[in-house]
Amino acid sequence: MKKFTQSIIGSTICNLALAYIVFMLARLIFFFVNYSYFAPYMDSSLAWDMLQGAIRFDTTALLYINGLYILLALFPLHIKEKKGYFLFCKIAYVVLNSIALAGNLIDSVYFQFTGRRSTATVFNEFSNEGNIAGIFLKEFFIHWYLVLIFVVVILATWKIYRTPSVSTRFNKGAYYIKHSITFIIVIGISVIGIRGGIGKAVRPITISNANQYVNRPIETAVVLNTPFSIIRTIGKKAFETPQYMNDEDMKATYSPVHTPSDSTLFTPRNVVVFIMESFGKEYSAWFNRHDHPEEYPGYMPFLDSIAQHSKTYRYSFGNGRKSIDGMPSVLSGIPMFVEPFFLTPASLNKVSSIAGELNNKDYYTAFFHGAPNGSMGFEAFARAAGFKDYYGMTEYKADDDRYKPSDYDGTWAIWDEEFLQFYADKMNTFKEPFMTAVFTASSHHPFVIPQRYNNHFAEGKVPIEKCVSYSDMALRRFFDKAKTQEWYNNTLFVFTADHTNESHHPEYKNELGIFEVPIIFYAPGDSSFSPAYHEDVIAQQIDIMPTVLDYLGYDLPFVSFGSSLFDSDTDKSFAVNYNNGIYQLIKDDYILQFDGKSAVGMYDFKKDRLLKENIIEKVPQQHEMEHFLKAVIQQYMQRMNTDQITIKQ
């Protein structure tokens, strides 16, 4: 046995087995770091299925990652029989597998914010962040235990790695025959492993194949590994137009084109949109007063007080899981399907927004975000979507009478309290009517607040909750100033979150809860605007654009994938989102899950909040919902690929 492990072929097999162990160890760490997302639904049967899937995906990733090492180790040339060459092979092996391990460990933390494994677009998401090195350094200190695990595993890998013994005496003919045959066999096995199987019916496995090993889409993150998810999505076209139905049927079933009636009368009111970083519904007492209110003390008391005098919705959802998903959804009515719109070639399409449409009515429009200009691609999207001006950290710092170095949080942006005061003061200088939007920043990882407030806000059960309370206080201070201004009573205020964040209640950790965000419309100066709490309407972020334009009486056609929440026909309301290769449609009492080919899940979410009872093929609404969702997907993909997300003039 010792002789075999010291041979080139034997040592290579041993080292690949070691790589398998490291991949599986990383998966166990991922599982236990995110234990509360998976444990309530886990049983032995599911665990066995997931293990089978994990081995399949690890095989593909392992062969991708170790391809260079395998080539170096097994290439049939006798001149490689040298200590220096074998040391080079060892270094290549350890470095490549270290990168893979790092990706898996990083995703153990990042998953809590995205609900999925990272894909190739992750490199573009942070490409505009000038402080990315500082952010990573802070994360290393916060998650020191993962850094320690990484170092220990890499040192152990270096120690356990099997280096073949150097052969000085061998028959060259036999050597080349033996090693050539081995090399050809290994190449063949590697091709099969990378594809995920053998046979004409087997297509190269993709992320979506993970769904066959799980009961819930979110569980695919355990089956997958980060290297596979990244490698398999490099260069992949995000939007493929399906042919579920002919165009006539598609348009009759669903159309994102909104055509107001000829009798519509436009009223030029101001519009102010707040995209509150990570303000998930879980942190609200108002939105959780129905079920176990004692478990929801609430960390956004001011926004809750606004909600009581607004039009709000018990069932309201985001259309993505990241900040770069939230902005197109809220302002342009574009949901996130497959990959963030920002990061796809479709981002070069002509795109509109609330601002872009209101420019047609001579509005002044501006977007505000306290991070460095260019951060997250927000400035680029704001300008493409029609905002006339952008106010970021550069503009804030240019105000010498206002700016102090302590106004910067040290990681991401200007503190919300200071920046929202800047926002209010700037709006006081704008000519009416205006439309503005602000994207807050302080309720964000690494979950810190100004030192002067360290003992001011309750800690909560997860670190973000005190940050939500701080940003809520900053919002209250904004309104203390804004309500004294002349423009205030002629303004519609809209509030939502970009996405959800840390959770500690099980109902907010499943495929529905991870998308639950508040949607609030507040018009303090409009006596005809009646506050209402709707329990019969499904609301989503992409409804905000058509709802705002409907409220104003906008009389020009436009494209938005949502619908007006002020439409009296509640049967039209729905929500869509996408995660881990699964499309979701929320309509009436049900949530339908669809993998692009067929329905894989159906739940009565109003009765089954934890989504434990899959009632697929048991309710008559399923097939109508599936047909509707197919029409939405086909419209979306077709319009993205043909640049039809605006009305052509």
Positions of predicted regions on the chain:
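Soluble catalytic regions of membrane-associated enzymes that act on cell-envelope
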Residues: 199-560, 568-573, 579
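Membrane-interface soluble catalytic domains
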Residues: 205-206, 526-649
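Short, function-defining helix-loop hinge/capping sites that tune catalysis or transport
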Residues: 35, 66, 115, 285-286, ...
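Short, motif-level signal for alpha-helix interfacial/capping segments enriched in acidic residues
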Residues: 85, 254-259, 476, 582-587, ...
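Residue-level recognition of alpha-helix termini/interfacial anchor residues
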Residues: 140-144, 423, 453, 617-623
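Short, hydrophobic/amphipathic alpha-helical patches that form generic packing surfaces
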Residues: 53, 101-104, 228-233, 631-635
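Transmembrane and membrane-interface helices of multi-pass
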Residues: 2-224
